[in-house]
C-alpha cells in the first residue's frame, strides 16, 4: 500500500492510496470462494458450483464489494500509520479501475485542530459572594402569595400591579392596522407583554374612562410595516382589578408540602430551595466566565464537519421543543444555529484539551453528589437516585457534567479569580 498525504486548505486533508493489483485479486478470489459455498445455481449442488461459473455470474459484483471494503480498510490503516485524526465522515474519490492493475483512489476529509492552550493566566473571573437573607425569603414568600392571589374589583386608578380589561383600537397615520384591535382584552400589568408606553398610558385611569395614548413601535418589532412607527391607541378601560393576597394560613402553607403548616416551616423550605438555586447559579456564573475567557484566549480553527453535525443536533432539539418531526427539523435554516453550533464545538474542543492535558477522569464522588443535589428538588429523592443508578446513559451524562466541572476548575486554578459581593436578586436576574 502506497500512501501520500497533502493539506488542501486549513484543516482539509487529501490522502492518496494505491492498492496493489495482487492484493485486490487475492481478496476477490477469497470472497468468490466464500460465495461458492453459499450460492445455489440450477444444475449444481450447494457448495459444488465450479469457480469459473461463480466468477462469471458474481465476479463483477464481488469485485465491486471487495474494492469498497479494501478502500475503507486501507484508509483506516493509512490514518493510523500517518497518525491522522479525521473529524467527520470522509469523502472517497475513486480513481479509474483497470483489471489486473494497481488501483489508486483519494480520500478527502478534515482533521481536528492541534490545540495548544494558552492565556489561562490572563482569564479574569468574578466569583459572586452571596447569601440568602431574611429579606430575600420575604420577597420569595410575597411572590408565592402573588402567584396564588385572587383578583377583586378596584375603584381607584390602575397602577403597575393591577389587572385591567380593555377594548382598544390602534392606528398608524390615521389608518387602523391588522392585529391592532381587541375587545375585552385582559392585561396583567407589569409583565412587559405590550409595547413600551402602552401600560404607562393606562396607569392613572379608572374603570369607565375612554382615552387615547401615543406610543412608538420598537425598531425590532416583528411586523415589518410597524417597525419604528408612531401609533395611537383609543382605549376603553372597562375594569380595573387588584390582587387579593392569601394569608399565610396552615391550609395555604400545606399546599407547598410543609406538613406542619407553620410559617417557620414554610420559610425553612423556601430558604432551602433558594439556597439550592443559588448554589447552581453561582456555579453557572463562574463557569460561563471561565469558558468565555478560555474561548477568547484561544482562537482555533473548527472543522466544518463538526459544525454541521452540531447544527443537526440543534435543529432536532428545536423541532422537538415545538412538536416538529425529523423532516421539519432539517428544513430549519442552518443560519439560525450556525453561530451557536460553532461556539459549542469550540468549547468542546478546548475543554477536551484541558481534560487531556490534565489527565482528568470523572470523579465518582462528585457524580454522586451531583445526582443527590439534583434529586433533592423532587418529592422522593431516593427514588430519583435509584432511577439514575440503574440507567447507564443517565449515569454517563452525569459523569460528563462532572468531568466538565473538573475541567473548568482546572482553568480556574490558573485564572485570576476575585470575589464580588452580590445580592440574591442581582445574581438570579443575571441567569434569566
UniProtKB/Swiss-Prot annotation:
Superkingdom of the organism of origin: Bacteria
GO terms under biological process: 'de novo' cotranslational protein folding; cell division; chaperone-mediated protein folding; protein transport; protein unfolding
Subcellular location: Cytoplasm
Gene3D superfamilies named in the record: 3.10.50.40, Trigger factor ribosome-binding domain, Trigger factor, C-terminal domain
Sorted UniProt keywords: Cell cycle, Cell division, Chaperone, Cytoplasm, Isomerase, Rotamase
Residue stretches making up the PPIase FKBP-type domain: 161-246
Its EC number(s): 5.2.1.8
Main localization category: cytoplasm
Database matches in Pfam families: FKBP_C, Trigger_C, Trigger_N
HAMAP family reported in the protein's UniProt record: Trigger_factor_Tig (MF_00303)
The protein's role, per its UniProt record: Involved in protein export. Acts as a chaperone by maintaining the newly synthesized protein in an open conformation. Functions as a peptidyl-prolyl cis-trans isomerase.
Name listed for the protein in its UniProt record: Trigger factor
Species, as recorded: Cronobacter sakazakii (strain ATCC BAA-894)
UniProt lineage: Bacteria, Pseudomonadati, Pseudomonadota, Gammaproteobacteria, Enterobacterales
Encoding gene (name): tig
Amino acid at each position: 500500500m502506497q500512501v501520500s498525504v497533502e493539506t488542501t486548505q486549513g484543516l482539509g486533508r487529501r490522502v492518496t492510496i494505491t492498492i496493489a493489483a495482487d492484493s485486490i485479486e487475492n481478496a476477490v478470489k477469497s470472497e468468490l470462494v466464500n460465495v461458492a459455498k453459499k450460492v445455489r445455481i440450477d444444475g449444481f449442488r450447494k457448495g459444488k458450483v465450479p469457480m469459473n461459473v461463480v466468477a462469471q455470474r458474481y465476479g463483477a459484483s464481488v469485485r465491486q464489494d471487495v474494492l469498497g471494503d479494501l478502500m475503507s480498510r486501507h484508509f483506516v490503516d493509512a490514518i493510523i500509520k500517518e497518525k491522522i485524526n479525521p473529524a467527520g465522515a470522509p469523502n472517497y474519490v475513486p480513481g479509474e479501475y483497470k483489471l489486473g492493475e494497481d488501483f489508486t483512489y483519494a480520500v478527502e476529509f478534515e482533521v481536528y485542530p492541534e490545540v495548544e492552550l494558552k492565556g489561562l493566566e490572563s482569564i479574569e473571573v468574578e466569583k459572586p459572594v452571596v447569601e440568602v437573607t431574611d429579606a430575600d425569603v420575604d420577597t420569595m414568600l410575597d411572590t408565592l402569595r402573588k402567584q396564588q392571589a385572587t383578583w377583586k374589583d378596584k375603584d381607584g386608578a390602575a397602577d403597575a400591579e393591577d389587572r385591567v380589561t380593555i377594548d382598544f383600537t390602534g392606528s398608524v397615520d390615521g389608518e387602523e392596522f391588522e392585529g391592532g384591535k381587541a375587545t375585552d382584552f385582559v392585561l396583567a400589568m407589569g409583565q412587559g407583554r405590550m409595547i413600551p408606553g402602552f401600560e404607562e398610558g393606562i396607569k392613572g385611569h379608572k374603570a369607565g374612562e375612554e382615552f387615547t395614548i401615543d406610543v412608538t413601535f420598537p425598531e425590532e418589532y416583528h411586523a415589518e410595516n410597524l417597525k419604528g412607527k408612531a401609533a395611537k391607541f383609543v382605549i376603553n378601560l372597562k375594569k380595573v382589578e387588584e390582587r387579593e393576597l392569601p394569608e399565610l394560613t396552615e391550609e395555604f402553607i400545606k399546599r407547598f408540602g410543609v406538613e406542619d403548616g407553620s410559617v417557620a416551616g414554610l420559610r425553612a423550605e423556601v430558604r432551602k430551595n433558594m439556597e439550592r438555586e443559588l448554589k447552581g447559579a453561582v456555579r453557572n456564573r463562574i463557569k460561563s466566565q471561565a469558558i468565555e475567557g478560555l474561548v477568547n484566549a484561544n482562537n482555533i480553527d473548527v472543522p466544518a464537519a463538526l459544525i454541521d453535525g452540531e447544527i443537526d443536533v440543534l435543529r432536532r432539539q428545536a423541532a422537538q421543543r415545538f412538536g416538529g418531526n425529523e423532516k421539519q427539523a432539517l428544513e430549519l435554516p442552518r443560519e439560525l444555529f450556525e453561530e451557536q453550533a460553532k461556539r459549542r464545538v469550540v468549547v468542546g474542543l478546548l475543554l477536551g484539551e484541558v481534560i487531556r492535558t490534565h489527565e482528568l477522569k470523572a470523579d465518582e464522588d462528585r457524580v454522586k453528589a451531583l445526582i443527590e443535589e439534583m434529586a433533592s428538588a423532587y418529592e422522593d429523592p431516593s427514588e430519583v437516585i435509584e432511577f439514575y443508578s440503574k440507567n447507564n446513559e443517565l449515569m454517563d451524562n452525569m459523569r460528563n457534567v462532572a468531568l466538565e466541572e473538573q475541567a473548568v476548575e482546572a482553568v480556574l486554578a490558573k485564572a485570576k479569580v476575585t470575589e464580588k459581593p452580590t445580592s440574591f436578586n442581582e445574581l438570579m436576574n443575571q441567569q434569566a
